Structures are given as structure tokens and as C-alpha cells.
Amino acid sequence: MTKTRRPRQAVPRSIAVPRCAATPRPVRRAGAAALALTGLLSAAACSGPSSGKQAAEPVITAEPAALSPSYGSGSPSASANGVVPLTPDVTARLDAAIQRVLSQTGVPGVNVGIITPGGTYLKSFGVADKTTGTPMDPSLHLRIGSETKTFTATAVLRLVDQGKVGLDDPISAYVDGVPGGDGITVRQLGEMRSGLFPYSSDPDFVNTLINDPNHVFTPDQLLAYGYKHPAVSPPGTQFQYNNSNYIILGKLVEKLGGLPAGRFITDQVITPAALGQTSFPTDGTMPSPYAHGYTEQTPSGAIADATNWNPSWAWTAGAMISTVADLESWARTMATGALLKPATQAERLKTLPTGDPGVGYGFGLFDNNGWIGHNGSLPGYESVAVYLPQAQSTLALQLNTDVLYQGSEPSSLFANEITKILSPKHVYSIPPASAAPSTPASGSASGPAPGATSTGSPPSLPASNSPSTVRT
């Protein structure tokens, strides 16, 4: 996520898995979107110091809080499992908090789904199309950015369960051409600790994507942008959110699965998980019905409709599409390991520090103060899908913009405010992005990608390169 402050409109506006672009503000943001493709680790996904200025007293922040301002005396307390009962009063507080974030951030529309043992919450706010004023609706399809990484990681782990690959095998045993591949393991790629330079931080990539959002990239072309740079760190030594890792894992899935990555993920993950509204696109077409997505990752920095931009630049790091109901279901399936052997899921859940307090990253998922899952951001869209195991509760949200608010991913702000009310002892929190996300806007691939620290760029990353990152 870029920390650069961008002009905001007075009216709501609606991904950016890749995140900011190069030196010019518009390009910088565009690059961020591509890199973002992260989701939850939006702050971590940034790779560089923030050059933007934040308001002295922002009304909304993503800072952790023991209690939300809207969760005061007289409100029901969290039960032993960590979530509050969804009483009419709590529901009203959630409505008010979501409306407040929607208004203050200028997000066009958002879908929010919550499932707890004591009740459910499924509501839409704002508009799905700023031109027609069509209301946002839970049935609509939106791009999910870096949530895609959770599907790619699951596909790899299905191959582990089938005995076709080992997590500690060198990637060179399966994928040719990876610099230093003999010393980089499959596990390190999934944990964002390969040390490779992220392709979505390369200025040439960012410029190509921002100036031609319908450009069709091949996986090898994407990786080539990163491979021309030296490694950022030795394998296994530091966390750096990096879309390149998940493009390489996509190639591994194709090699061992014997099918195009999207087809394998559909057959081995989407279908077994019974996600009837989730898909891996092969072009820029959106399945109907869908919400339009809005971004400022453009050459001029002007807001544009990114709905049908080609997601090939994000591929297995952030190209997928889903609905809020499917994300609710997927968050539980992913966090509980329903598609994997228990021992394999246990390996996936071994999270390591990211540099952000309370946030650890495992094999294609994070633990954010107890919430297990991921976030995503790419030009036009952002998402969060997380599960709180001890409370058997799920939170999923989707919004149709990736435009940052005072340096923060709007999806993180919604999740933060919601969990302050829903689970005050487990508040979802990601610091504002420092400069540019480490993945193109996406998600997902939104959200989260740290460098040497979760919010800063690795010391070895060229300073001129950090702002030219696209989020995913």
C-alpha cells in the first residue's frame, strides 16, 4: 500500500493487488496496486519510506485499540470465545461504524459478512456503480487480489499431500531459471522469505502496467522483471511480501499438477471447497452480476473504472474473483485446513514475524491478532477474509476501490473498526503503508507485504524503486 497521499473526491469512489507506481504520483500508486495483491498485509506489502503526509488527527486509523469508541459502557462484553453477541445494539453499532468509514474514506461501496456461533451479519453499503447509482449487493462479484495467494498456497499444499513435492525441497528441483533456486525452498516462497526482488517493484513493469492496463503478461515475463535485479536478502532471513514468490509457485503448480494453474486451482481447491461463485479468470471479463471497481493507479492519477482491466499481471498472486459469501466460506475452510491433511495444515499455520506487531505470516496466510486469513488489493478492488478459530467466527468484506485513505488500505480500516466492536480483544490492525506495496494492486495481490520491516523497504532495494510498486 502506498503511503503517498492522493487527492480525494468529495463523493464516494470506488484493485490494486499491485500498489503504487514510480516517481510520479499516479505511476507510483499504480505500481502499488500491482504489488498489493496482498490483502491483509497491505502495510507490510509496502516497500519504501512514505513520502506522503498524513493528517494530524485522522478520524479513522488502523491502530489497535482495546475498545472501539463505539463500544462503550452498557455494550455487551466479549464472551469467553472472543466475540460479542450480535444483539440489535451491536448490529446498530456495526452499521454506524461501517457507514462512518464509508463516508470518511470515500469508498463507493462495501459488502460485509460476519458469521458467529450466535448469529450472522450480511449487509451492503454504498454503490456498485457510481455512474448508475446501482446499490452494492452481497450477490455481486468483485476481484479479490491477494486472496488469490491463499488458493495458490492451498494448491501447493494439496500437491504436498499427494506426495509430489516437499515444503523443504529447493524450488530448482521443479522450476527452472529461479536465481539462487538451489538455496530457496518451496516453504520460503510460500512464507515470503525467498529474498528475491519483487517484479511488481520494477519501474519498467509498473510503467507498462499503468500505461496499458489491458497488457497481457506471461508468468515468465513477470518474473523476468524481478530477476534482472539482485536478491534483496539471503533466503529465509527476512519477511518481504513479494508477488514473485507466488508466480513461481503458480509455475510449480502447473509443472506438478499437469494443468494450467487456474484449472488446477479450480479442480483441486475451488470445487472441493464448494465455492460456486469463485473463479480464476483468463482475461479481463467479469462474471455477472458484478460491482465496478475504481482506482487512481493511472498515468495522470485521475480516478478510472478498472473493472475490466486484464489481471494477467497478478496471475496466481492476485487474479481471482469471488463474492462475500464465498469468501466467508473460504476463510473457514482455509483456516481450519478442511482440504488438507492435519499435519500439512499444521505446517501452514507456522507463522513467523513480519515486523508488524501482532501480525505473523505462514504459508499463504497471516495471523492478525488471532484472525487467520488474508487480505487483497489490486486496481479497483480490495478484500479481507479471516477466521477467528477460538470463536469459530468469520469476517469477510469486499470493496470496490483500492484508493488509499491517509496512507491506509480502506479494507484494513473497515476490518479494524468492525473488530473493535466484534472482537475487542482481537482487533485486526495493519499500520498505514509506508510508501508502496510490495505487490501490484490486488490484492490482495491489497494487501500485505513488508520489506526489511513490515512497513519499510529492504535496505538493498533501490530507493528509486520503492515507490514504483504495484499492490496485489
What are these regions (language model features)?
Residues 88, 116, 125, 129-241:
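Active-site-proximal loop and beta-strand segments within enzyme catalytic domains
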Residues 122, 184-371, 375-379:
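Short, surface-exposed loop or secondary-structure junction motifs
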Residues 90, 94, 148-151, 245, ...:
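Hydrophobic/aromatic residues within well-ordered alpha-helical segments
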Residues 103, 176-179, 254:
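Alpha-solenoid HEAT/Armadillo repeat architecture
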Residues 1-51, 58-61, 65:
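Secretory targeting and sorting signals
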Residues 125-127, 296, 399:
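Active-site donor-binding loop signature of nucleotide-sugar glycosyltransferases
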Residues 98-99, 112, 118-120, 141-168, ...:
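Active-site SXXK
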Residues 46-123, 266-267, 307-472:
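Catalytic loop of the DD-peptidase/beta-lactamase superfamily, centered on the K-T-G motif
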